[in-house]
């Protein structure tokens, strides 16, 4: 203990200030994360700082100073030291870890690879024309292992080819040609290793949420719950109106089919009886014109006229429907816009 205190007393003041600053940032923000910054140029780092300045604080410090700050905080931030490795930056925010992960993923952009670097994945050059006219570039591509030729007055890649496999060292010639072809094998940006929030450490695998699938699952679950509530007659604030409408409809159908003389079904029963009566009368009149009296014959005539008028009006209604179709499309777009608005709630 005395040895540790003696060592601490000989730490330069600027290091002590840096340690205190790290501790203060951890304690004053809801979420604290560690990010990898390997391969990020200074200019890109400055742009990332500007882009994040309204939602997060990005700090680059020595790993030894960060470790000392975490040691001094003790059990306040347990488990985060194991993510402190190589080139590391600290990030502090009051947003959720999920929102932080999404923001950091947006900082990643394709970047050219340098000669001598290790290919992170298979590097493939696709078959097709390039923007280069015939010239020395043809020989340079071929010497880099890219199958090139002249086609229609332009340099073209003759076939799709994997020019460097994952894990292999990228030759300098190939790196130069890839940049000229605007093939950027690297994805460079802040790489979140872990985020700490209220005693829980979140790793990227947990934070990488497919928002569209998650949103669809929520909608499907809500629909299934609604259907279950209606089909099992389980009343809730969301389904009570549907259940009452369903019960009313079923009660009315029962009253009509069982011929129960109640005020709510009398009109339907009378209308049904009238239709049945006119149907029987029509068949009787077809067989014998004298089978129906004048009053009934007049009713049958009115029904026939109404049927003819309805048949004549059908084409006109079809034309009106065609004219209304654009409006329906506009309504569909409005519904889609509404769904897009809901999607915005997920960040």
Swiss-Prot record:
<dbReference type="Pfam" id="PF00466">
    <property type="entry name" value="Ribosomal_L10"/>
</dbReference>
<dbReference type="Pfam" id="PF17777">
    <property type="entry name" value="RL10P_insert"/>
</dbReference>
<dbReference type="InterPro" id="IPR040637">
    <property type="entry name" value="Ribosomal_uL10-like_insert"/>
</dbReference>
<keyword id="KW-0687">Ribonucleoprotein</keyword>
<dbReference type="GO" id="GO:0002181">
    <property type="term" value="P:cytoplasmic translation"/>
</dbReference>
<dbReference type="InterPro" id="IPR001790">
    <property type="entry name" value="Ribosomal_uL10"/>
</dbReference>
<dbReference type="InterPro" id="IPR043141">
    <property type="entry name" value="Ribosomal_uL10-like_sf"/>
</dbReference>
<comment type="subunit">
    <text>Part of the 50S ribosomal subunit. Forms part of the ribosomal stalk which helps the ribosome interact with GTP-bound translation factors. Forms a heptameric L10(L12)2(L12)2(L12)2 complex, where L10 forms an elongated spine to which the L12 dimers bind in a sequential fashion.</text>
</comment>
<dbReference type="InterPro" id="IPR050323">
    <property type="entry name" value="Ribosomal_protein_uL10"/>
</dbReference>
<comment type="function">
    <text>Forms part of the ribosomal stalk, playing a central role in the interaction of the ribosome with GTP-bound translation factors.</text>
</comment>
<dbReference type="GO" id="GO:0003735">
    <property type="term" value="F:structural constituent of ribosome"/>
</dbReference>
<feature type="compositionally biased region" description="Acidic residues">
    <location>
        <begin position="325"/>
        <end position="338"/>
    </location>
</feature>
<keyword id="KW-0689">Ribosomal protein</keyword>
<keyword id="KW-0699">rRNA-binding</keyword>
<keyword id="KW-0694">RNA-binding</keyword>
<comment type="similarity">
    <text>Belongs to the universal ribosomal protein uL10 family.</text>
</comment>
<dbReference type="InterPro" id="IPR043164">
    <property type="entry name" value="Ribosomal_uL10-like_insert_sf"/>
</dbReference>
<dbReference type="GO" id="GO:0070180">
    <property type="term" value="F:large ribosomal subunit rRNA binding"/>
</dbReference>
<dbReference type="GO" id="GO:0022625">
    <property type="term" value="C:cytosolic large ribosomal subunit"/>
</dbReference>
<dbReference type="InterPro" id="IPR022909">
    <property type="entry name" value="Ribosomal_uL10_arc"/>
</dbReference>
<protein>
    <recommendedName>
        <fullName>Large ribosomal subunit protein uL10</fullName>
    </recommendedName>
</protein>
<feature type="region of interest" description="Disordered">
    <location>
        <begin position="312"/>
        <end position="347"/>
    </location>
</feature>
């Amino acid at each position: 203990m005395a040895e540790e205190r003696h060592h601490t007393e000989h730490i330069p003041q600027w290091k002590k200030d840096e340690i205190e600053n790290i501790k203060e940032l951890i304690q004053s923000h809801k979420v604290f994360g560690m990010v990898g910054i390997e391969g990020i140029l200074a200019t890109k780092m400055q742009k990332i700082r500007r882009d994040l300045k309204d939602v997060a604080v990005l700090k680059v410090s020595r790993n030894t100073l960060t470790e000392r700050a975490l040691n001094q905080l003790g059990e306040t931030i347990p488990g985060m030291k194991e993510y402190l490795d190589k080139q590391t930056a600290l990030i502090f925010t009051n947003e959720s870890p999920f929102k932080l992960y999404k923001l950091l993923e947006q900082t990643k952009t394709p970047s050219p690879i340098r000669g001598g670097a290790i290919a992170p994945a298979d590097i493939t050059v696709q078959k097709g024309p390039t923007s280069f006219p015939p010239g020395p570039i043809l020989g340079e591509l071929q010497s880099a292992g890219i199958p090139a030729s002249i086609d229609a007055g332009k340099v073209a890649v003759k076939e799709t080819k994997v020019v460097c496999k994952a894990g292999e060292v990228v030759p300098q010639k190939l790196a130069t040609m890839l940049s000229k072809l605007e093939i950027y094998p690297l994805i460079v940006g802040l790489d979140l290793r872990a985020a700490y929030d209220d005693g829980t450490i979140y790793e990227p695998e947990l934070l990488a949420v497919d928002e569209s699938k998650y949103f669809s699952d929520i909608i499907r679950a809500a629909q299934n719950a609604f259907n279950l509530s209606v089909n099992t007659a389980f009343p809730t604030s969301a389904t009570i109106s549907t259940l009452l409408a369903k019960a009313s409809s079923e009660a009315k159908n029962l009253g009509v089919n069982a011929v129960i003389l109640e005020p709510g079904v009398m009109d339907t029963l009378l209308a049904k009886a009238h239709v049945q009566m006119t149907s029987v009368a029509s068949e009787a009149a077809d067989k014998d014109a004298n089978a129906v009296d004048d009053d009934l014959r007049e009713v049958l005539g009115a029904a026939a006229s109404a049927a003819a008028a309805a048949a004549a009006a059908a084409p006109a209604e079809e034309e009106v429907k065609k004219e209304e179709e654009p409006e329906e499309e506009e309504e569909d777009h409005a519904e889609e816009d509404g769904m897009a608005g809901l999607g915005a709630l997920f960040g």
